[in-house]
Amino acid sequence: RTHTPSDQYYVSHVTEKGWITVYEGKPSTDWDRKKESDIDCPVIAHETGQRCMYPNFAEMEKYTGVVSPRNFEVFRERLARNGMLHQADDFFRATGAHTVLQYKEVNESLLRTANSGGFQLLGLADFPGQGSAFVGILDAFWESKGLVSPEKYRESCAPTVLLARMPKRTYMNNETFTAKLEIYHYGEHPLKRGKLNWELKDGKGNTVKKGNISTPAIPCATVDSLGKVNISLNKVSHAEKLTLHTT
């Protein structure tokens, strides 16, 4: 729908300045939809994400009433015909993990957008009413698929979320990892001044480096800067995955 002057808010995929709905992640996290959201009323990004995963054939046994999982039957038959039915759970788990990761990317990009009025997913649950849309972290019965815990999901979608703007994700050990830390806070109460602890860990949980930064008081309804982290990687001796943890 075209934005009109009478709109008190605007729910859309796109404004006159570009796309506000996000479907993708990027090689960095230092980006947002601020420019695209800068119009004369609050904008809400419509149907963000929509990451489709492989069906979970174990869900078929839940259909005990008048509705039959005919779409599941078609997909299962095709997989069996191609000799890959034994890989069905692997496909489901792998694509499900990718979906969870993509929702984290999408959600955080819009939380970094300080002038965004919000966002709405196509759904937390799969949508079976118009073909097959396996886009949810919950199945069509609103039950968990076992892909992510509620606590883990809330790390990137909650009233208060810590954010890190990273210019890139791949570094050499002669470089310095940098991240601008921010907080999205729409909780009920302001946050007092304090300290934010950060820790860079390897895949085995060993600490590469840790420290803390002093944080200012944070009012409600804001996206605020907390400070910057600079970590020399000269002690990293081989290629590996490192994760930044904050508390």
Label each residue range with its predicted role:
Residues 175-216, 225-232, 240-247:
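Beta-strand-rich binding/interaction modules
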Residues 73-86, 150-158, 212-214:
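Short C-terminal domain-edge/linker segments immediately following a structured domain
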Residues 97-104, 113, 147, 171, ...:
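Conserved structured core elements
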Residues 1-138:
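Substrate-binding/catalytic cleft of secreted carbohydrate-active enzymes
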Residues 122-187, 196:
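Aromatic-rich peripheral "rim/lid" segments of glycoside hydrolase catalytic domains that contact
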Residues 62-67, 138-142, 182, 199-202, ...:
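Short, low-complexity, polar/charged sequence segments that are solvent-exposed and flexible
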Residues 95, 167-169, 186, 219, ...:
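Outer-membrane beta-barrel proteins
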